[in-house]
Amino acid sequence: MKRAPRIFAFLPILLFVFHLLLPPPAALSQGTDSAAVEVCVLLNDLRVQRGLSELGSDPLLEQTARAYAADLRRRGVLSHVDELDRRALQRFQARGGTTVLVGELLGSGADPAAVAAAWEASAGHREVLLNPLWTHCGVGSESAGATTVWVVLFTSHRIYPLEILRCSGGYLVRGRLASDQAEEPVLISGIDPIDPFEWDSATGAFSFFISREREGIYHRLGYRSGENTLVVTNTFFPVKVAGSDCPETEAVTSDRERECR
């Protein structure tokens, strides 16, 4: 007898919003398996049918989802908490993710269409799937005998793309604001605000410089959005998430950055 798919969902608190006076769609990435691609297409179809945007793929979300699908298969459970007591957001950030909002769908079943239909039929899962804040997703799957374990992760990239690069003397943080509500980018190093040395309000492009002395400090990146309110979109320790080194020609392109050093 054909088993109905088993499903689980988790939706975290949606946004961290701080008052400034207080301290502290893309193509699917290469290497994605065909079943995961099918799930992505099915979920995007459900969103489009309800007037929502399609989700782009996020390679880091995909890696996190695949790793957790393998973990769930090994443990023989469907749980939103891993053996280290971490939920989806913590697992994503442990792999270098910086966004502050991650949702998760879990399921098991051999037929991707049946699993997607089960998520749609469940009010809690549908709430996660149809969240209008999502911009990207990542799907992981792991075969377990006659069935398959599925993990779908969602996140909201309000700053995309975002790069955190090592430079001589510090770190270059650059990206593009994607939010229509954004008035200007904001970076807080510990409790100290850092001004952008580049900011183009027309395109949303910005750059910040973080000195080497502050590489181990907790940073909050986001944007100011009316009534002196800061919406935090990304959090990170520069020393833990920095990617490749940036060329020196890019690292010293402004007097402001030289002053930061």
Where would I find each of the regions flagged by the language model?
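Functional surface patches built around histidine and acidic residues
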Residues: 25-261
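Bacterial N-terminal signal peptides
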Residues: 10-22
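Bacterial N-terminal signal peptides that target proteins for export
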Residues: 1-11
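Compositionally biased, intrinsically disordered low-complexity regions enriched in proline and serine
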Residues: 3, 19-20, 219, 224
